[in-house]
């Protein structure tokens, strides 16, 4: 073992945390808590825009369900208990008083149904993202950091709220 490897191993923290578990081992409750916390983090970072944009997480298992925010709530109002569980067809699968934004469902169901390794999907409305999206030519890869997105950006026509 190299000296660097020994230092890394010596500084390793054995903390039992849901963020360090294998995704397949996470319970729905843990995913709800993490997703609600993620909504608050996105709000804190200034990446939210009113009620628009969505964060979703796929629930492990054969049912192909995922959690999404209730339509009409601001990001800082989303809680673990008011997240809505839906299937890939947009059906709400547990009793709730909330609806789901159809545009959010369209975007996230497309990703969750086609990318089995995309456990969590984020669609935000940052100022920088909205500015880029308004450009006729879309994302221009003019520097090193932008090159990470070369041939990796997909566009979807707006289907309305």
Please place each PLM-identified region on the residue numbering:
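Glycine-rich flexible loops
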Residues: 1-161
């Amino acid at each position: 073992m190299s000296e660097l490897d020994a230092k890394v191993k010596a500084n390793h923290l054995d903390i039992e945390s849901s963020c360090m578990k294998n995704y397949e081992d996470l319970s729905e409750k843990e995913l709800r808590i993490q997703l609600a916390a993620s909504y608050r983090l996105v709000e804190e970072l200034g990446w939210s825009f009113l009620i628009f944009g969505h964060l979703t997480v796929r629930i492990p298992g054969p049912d192909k369900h995922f959690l999404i925010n209730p339509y009409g709530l601001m990001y800082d109002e989303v809680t673990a208990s008011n997240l809505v569980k839906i299937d890939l067809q947009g059906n709400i699968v547990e009793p709730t008083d909330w609806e789901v934004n159809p545009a959010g469902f369209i975007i996230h169901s497309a990703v969750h149904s086609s990318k089995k390794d995309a456990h969590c999907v984020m669609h935000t409305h940052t100022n920088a993202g909205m500015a880029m999206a308004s450009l006729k030519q879309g994302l221009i890869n003019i520097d090193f950091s932008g090159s990470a997105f070369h041939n990796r950006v997909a566009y979807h026509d707006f289907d309305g709220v």
